[in-house]
Structures are given as C-alpha cells and as structure tokens.
C-alpha cells in the first residue's frame, strides 16, 4: 500500500445496499480503526469491546471472498450518521 492507505487486515462495515450485494461479487466497505482521530469523515462506534472509528475516508470495494465472519451490527442511529456523513463528503462538501 502507498501513502496513507490502511494496509493491514481489519474489520469493516459493509456500506453498499443489500439489493446491490445480492447481485455483485463485491461489496463496498469502510474499514474500522481504533485510531481515534476525530474528524468529520470518521464516525465513532463501539466494536469488538472497544471504541473505534469507521474510516469513511477509506471506502473501497472488495471481493466477497475476502470477508470474514460478521462481528456485529450497527444501531439505526449509527447508520443515519454514516449516511449523512457520506452525503456530506460526496455531495454537499
């Protein structure tokens, strides 16, 4: 990996819609990080027993074959924040 790309294997949040995921061999994900760098394009969550951030600045598509087991799910309030943040990043910025 180059620059500031996240290189190591890490958990992530699938952000592509279920309807899309059903038909494609890839899913769109945002990696989770324990780096608590507080900027508006990262969303704070509690995962795997610790506080962390969804790194929406590192969104990417990956093959479904690279996915591991599901470790949890998000609350609707967290999903709304993620959607708002993505909209702000790519539409309203």
Positions of the model-derived regions?
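Conserved functional hotspots at enzyme active or ligand-binding sites that engage polyanionic ligands
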Residues: 1-93
């Amino acid at each position: 990996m180059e620059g500031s790309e996240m290189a190591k294997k890490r958990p992530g949040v699938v952000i592509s819609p279920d309807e899309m995921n059903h038909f494609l061999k890839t899913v769109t994900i945002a990696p989770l990080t324990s780096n608590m760098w507080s900027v508006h394009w990262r969303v704070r969550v509690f995962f795997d027993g610790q506080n962390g951030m969804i790194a929406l600045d590192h969104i990417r598509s990956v093959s479904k074959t690279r996915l591991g087991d599901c470790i949890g799910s998000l609350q609707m309030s967290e999903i709304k924040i993620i959607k708002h943040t993505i909209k702000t990043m790519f539409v309203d910025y």
